Amino acid sequence: MTQCPQEMITPGHGIIADALIMHGLIKILHIEGKMEGWAERRGERFVVCAERPDLNWIDQWEPMELLEIAAEFKAKGKDRASEEEEQRPYFGLVHDLSRSTVDPGNFSSWISDVREALYALKADFDLSEEHKEKRGEGRARSKKRGYYTLYLPLSGVYGKYVVENYGIRQSQYAVCATCFALSTLGYIYGTVKARVERRSSSGGGHDVFNLTFIPRERTSLRSLMALQRMAGLVEMRPGDLNELGAVVYMLSVGETIYAVREGVDILVWVTQRAGNFQRTVGVNIFRGDRLLEAIAEIKYRAPSWPKIARQLGSSLNVLGEYLAFGGDVYHVIRSVMADLGRKGGKLAGLEGLAEALKKIG
C-alpha cells in the first residue's frame, strides 16, 4: 500500500458510530477518486490514511436533492392529518433509511439535520486526533448550535440513562456536523439493513439487523469500498433469527463479493422498536472474510441458494454457527431440510449446499 498522505481518525463515539463515520468518509473519498490508501482499527476507533477530501461538489450531489424533496414535504405538510403525514414521498435512499429507523416520529428531523450537516461539512470537516475533546461532543443537557443528536441506528448510546451525582438523567448524545453527516452516510452507503416485523404475539413492532464491515488488520480502501456494494435494505419475514442467522440471510440474498482477500470483520447490531420503546441490542463482531468466502462457495455450488435462504427460518442460525465456528455438517443439513419441509419448500439444491459445507469445514 502507498505511503499515507494524511491520517484521519474517527473521534471515539463507540465502535458503531466510528465504523459508520469511517464508511461515510470512504464513500466521499470514492466519489473524489482518492482511493489510494488504507484503513485500520485502533481500539474502537478507525484510522483512514488518504488524501483529505475537498468536498467542493457536495452541494450539488444527487442525494441532496432527495433530502430537499423530503424536507420540503415536511414543511408543506405541517397542518395535514397525521395519517397523511405518514405517507411522505420517500424514495431511493431516503425510503430505505425511513424503513430502517426504529424512531419514525423523529425521522423527518433526522432528514432535516443530515441535510443541514452535509451543507456544513465542507467548512466543518475535521477528523483530527483530539476531535471529540476539542468539539465538546458527547452527553449534553442541551445541544449547542450546530450540533446534532446521534440517532439510535447510528450508535448504541442514544437514549440511555446517565448516573450523575447519585441522580439519574436522560440526555442526548450530541455530535458535530462532521460526525453526524459522515455517520449517516456510512449508515446509508456502508451498511446492510434487514427489517423484520415482529409477530403480534410478541408485542408487535419491528427489529432491524444492521451489518457493516470493519478492518481487522490494515485494509485497502478499495476493498472496503467494494464491500459497500452490498449496502442497502432487505425486508425479512417474521422469524426467530439471531445475529448470525441474519448475517447469513443478508449475505445470501445480497450481491456476492469474491474479491476481498484482506482481514475484515463484520460488525452487527440490532435496533428494536416495540410501542414507544426503542433500544440497541446484540452488538457483535464476527470474522467477515470467513463468512464471505463461505457464502460465495455455497452460492457457487448451489446456485438456487438465495431463493432457498429466503424460505428458511431458525435453520439459518444453525448454519451461521457452523460457518463462524465449525461443527457438525450433517446437523446443519438436517436442520435446513426440516425447516424447508415445514414451509413446503423444495429440497433441490441441498446437495450443492452439502458439498460446499464439506469443503468449507
From Swiss-Prot:
Q: What induces it?
A: Repressed by 5 J/m2 ultraviolet light and 50 mM NaCl, slightly induced by 20 J/m2 ultraviolet light, 100 and 150 mM Nacl. Member of the csa5-cas7-cas5a-cas3-cas3'-cas8a2 operon.
Q: Coiled-coil stretches, from where to where?
A: none
Q: Give the record's keywords alphabetically.
A: Antiviral defense
| Record note on quaternary structure | Monomer. Can form a Cascade complex with Csa5, Cas7, Cas5a, Cas3 and Cas3'.
Function as written in the Swiss-Prot or TrEMBL entry: CRISPR (clustered regularly interspaced short palindromic repeat) is an adaptive immune system that provides protection against mobile genetic elements (viruses, transposable elements and conjugative plasmids). CRISPR clusters contain sequences complementary to antecedent mobile elements and target invading nucleic acids. CRISPR clusters are transcribed and processed into CRISPR RNA (crRNA).
Swiss-Prot/TrEMBL GO biological process terms: defense response to virus
Annotated S-S bridges = none
Identify the stretch annotated as signal peptide in this record. Answer: none
Q: What is this protein called?
A: CRISPR system associated protein Cas8
